[in-house]
Regions:
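Secondary-structure boundary elements
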Residues: 1-57
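His-Asp-centered catalytic microenvironments across diverse enzyme cores
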Residues: 2-10, 14-22, 39, 84-189
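Short Gly/charged-rich anion-binding patches and loops
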Residues: 29, 65-68, 109
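Short low-complexity stretches enriched in small and charged residues
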Residues: 31-38, 68-81, 171-175
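Residue-level "edge-of-site" marker
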Residues: 47, 83-84
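Cysteine-centered nucleophilic/redox motifs
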Residues: 55-82, 114
Length: 189
């Protein structure tokens, strides 16, 4: 992880205290620690604090945790974003089998990431696929950490419904959502 932006963790916030108890004393070390947690859905998709307890996380919970940590530490340079991007094998290895089965070149997927001083930081991807992700963005919006649950899903579903009609996709929304879920499951294998 590039040392794009760093600060020492204080003992004044709950998230900082949890990290300090793990021996993590600054933001860059927190980024690396969270990046190394395995990908996996948490028991509550809206509760980003579960990543430490469950030792796994998604793009939403990992980045929401880091954004909340930065906010609790008074660091406004770190912002949480949700983007909708074209998910295909090149930028999301592991989804080609599902996309080929349904004869789709890509599926619009919602993805959370950070922007630190307007530079994208994504702890769920390696640097090579990060380049493809940026070039595949269709839409992005700054959100707050508590918006990773229902709001993110609503935003994603609204985008997909619009995409279905504008790109003349042959599937209905329910089928498309199932295809998307199959792609996500393929990432956990």
């Amino acid at each position: 992880m590039d040392k794009l932006f760093n600060f020492d963790l204080s003992n004044r916030s709950q998230l900082s205290q949890e990290l300090l108890n793990l021996g993590i004393s600054n933001f860059n070390d927190a980024l690396i620690y969270i990046q190394n947690l395995p990908y996996g859905r948490n028991s509550n998709r809206s509760d980003y604090s579960l990543i430490l307890k469950e030792q796994k996380g998604t793009c939403s919970t990992k980045h929401a945790f880091l954004a909340a940590l930065a906010k609790q530490e008074g660091k406004s340079e770190i912002k949480l974003y949700v983007g909708i991007y074209k998910m295909y094998e090149k930028n999301t290895p592991g989804v080609s089998g599902v996309l080929e089965k349904w004869q789709l070149p890509y599926v619009p997927e919602a993805h959370c990431y950070l922007k630190i001083n307007d530079t994208i930081v994504d702890v769920t991807r390696n640097n090579n696929s990060n380049i493809s992700f940026k070039s595949s963005l269709l839409f992005e919006e700054e959100i707050l950490s508590h918006q990773i649950g229902d709001y993110k899903v609503m935003l994603h579903q609204t985008f997909l419904k619009s995409w279905l009609t504008s790109d003349a996709i042959l599937y209905d929304f329910k089928t498309l959502w199932q295809i998307r879920e199959a792609c996500i499951r393929s990432l956990s294998k």
